[in-house]
């Protein structure tokens, strides 16, 4: 299964992340299928390749919870409905 998830890089205690498409069984910092964007939680900077993300979602890729929140904030996904 293909997942959209975060790949960590940067210095110790100053992490940045790349949003990538990867096989769900691959290790966190392994080689991605495709890089889809960038997220820096310290400065809250986000850059997304919208076309590539839309294509991956259409093909059935599942975002992790954190990536889902980033995509909802960027209006690429509808907010998840609260469970009753």
Curated annotation (Swiss-Prot):
Alphabetically ordered keywords of this record: Ribonucleoprotein, Ribosomal protein
Regions that span the bilayer: none
One Pfam family here: Ribosomal_S16
Gene Ontology annotations of biological process type: translation
Family note: Belongs to the bacterial ribosomal protein bS16 family.
One of the record's GO cellular component terms: cytoplasm
UniProt-listed PROSITE patterns: RIBOSOMAL_S16
One Gene Ontology MF term: structural constituent of ribosome
Entry-linked HAMAP family: Ribosomal_bS16
InterPro entries per the UniProt record, alphabetical: Ribosomal_bS16, Ribosomal_bS16_CS, Ribosomal_bS16_dom_sf
Name of protein: Small ribosomal subunit protein bS16
Keyword presence, Cell membrane: no
